[in-house]
Amino acid sequence: MIDIITTIAKYLIIIMCLIYTLSCYTVFRPKNKDRKEDLLDNQVIYMFVFLFLCYMVLFLQEFELKILIFFAAQVIFFEILMIVFPRIYKRCSRPLINNTCFLLGVGFVILTRLSFDLAMKQFAIAAGSVIVTSFIPLMMHKITIWNKFGWLYAVAGFLLLSTVFVFGINKYGAYNWVSIAGLKFQPSEFVKIIFVFFVAALLSKAKEFKDLVKITVIAALYVLVLVVEKDLGGALLYFVIYLMMLYVATAKASYLFGGLAAGSLAAIIADKIFTHVQIRVAVWKDPFSMIEGRGLQVCQSLFAIGTGSWFGMGLGNGRPFDIPVRESDFIFSAICEEFGVIFGICLIFVLMSSFILFMDISTRSRKLFNKLLCLGFGVCFLFQVFLSIGGVTKFIPSTGVTIPLVSYGGTSVISTLIIFNIIQGLHMLADSEEEEYEYIKAQESEKQYTRQNNRKNQ
């Protein structure tokens, strides 16, 4: 009987994910506010049904009360987040809140399957981060001088990134983690936020070519530090963020293509100079020839995805423990093995819809600084997804980058929630600017109408 229930649940989980994914895009269509609110309310239902099915399956396999308690804690947490946040910030982006909860939920489910202790730790970090970062939208909305500290951001970010040379520890071959008084964190996760602020602040004020040269040199120093740390994923991420922000700020395609050419040249040089780059490329080209050594991660990742096929083995029925670093860097492989490739594709589209929300806010923002902030964080979010999933599927060399909100990692979760709350603040600002613009437009129309009537009366 339990086997029948879990088999039915396996397909219902995929269906719920499909419906939620479709709703992420249909919510963009309706102009009617009530209709849009109904769609968003339905999204919440789909998410909770998905969570219920997953934890029902996990409970039926283990029969441990702690699983039900953990599920109940998540329901309370998500309910509070989705009810209280919109009441505090009436102009917030509800689709972004729903996506935040869904992605966190997927992460909690797969982590519960892999390690209940890690799932609990991730939940505690996420809950604490939501509380601590909840004031950020208010700060973004009320404080109007964020664009005045460009050089301060540049110096502060560079110094924080450089702490690895003093307190750095080796993790998976890279010195991009810091340990201070027993507390371990990844500085580059927080510095990328400061980096986007620094670039947006200075590019929004740049008037001459020499200004762009100065900004580019500082940005290049950030990338160089990451290369020295052997954080290849971070270096590539920062490079792409800067290049896209530079292109949008200047609207010059020559900078974009010039940057791509310079980046390609740098990649070729890095492949010739750095041994760790050569190893990553060799593993990417033919991981099966190194299956007993450095190629094991990628090989097991591909085996897991292939084993899961379209519909997955079912939650709890796969062999994700064969995948190295399954809780963080290679979590997408574990998801595809248990839930199936269809679920994995849906997850990618949900992540894509969040990026679209970022870009929508960017296009509606009237101030260049706000526009560049949204763009920078959007590119950061999407490219991080690309690096993570591209690496585990052998589309690109593995870079050790995690999926935002889904993969295990306290630093990653905190930094992503900070970014999402900054975007919420920018969304509120964009709405205020639109209302102000419409009001001014209405006032001008009324004045013009009055003048025309006065002329007729004369």
Language-model features: where?
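Hydrophobic transmembrane alpha-helical segments in integral membrane proteins
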Residues: 1-17
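Alpha-helical transmembrane segments
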Residues: 18-25, 82-83
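Membrane-interface helix-loop junction between the first two transmembrane segments
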Residues: 22-40
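Hydrophobic alpha-helical transmembrane segments of multi-pass inner membrane proteins, especially
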Residues: 64-293, 333-391, 418, 422, ...
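Long extracytoplasmic/lumenal interhelical loops at the membrane interface
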Residues: 305-342, 365
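Transmembrane alpha-helices of multi-pass inner-membrane enzymes
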Residues: 394-439
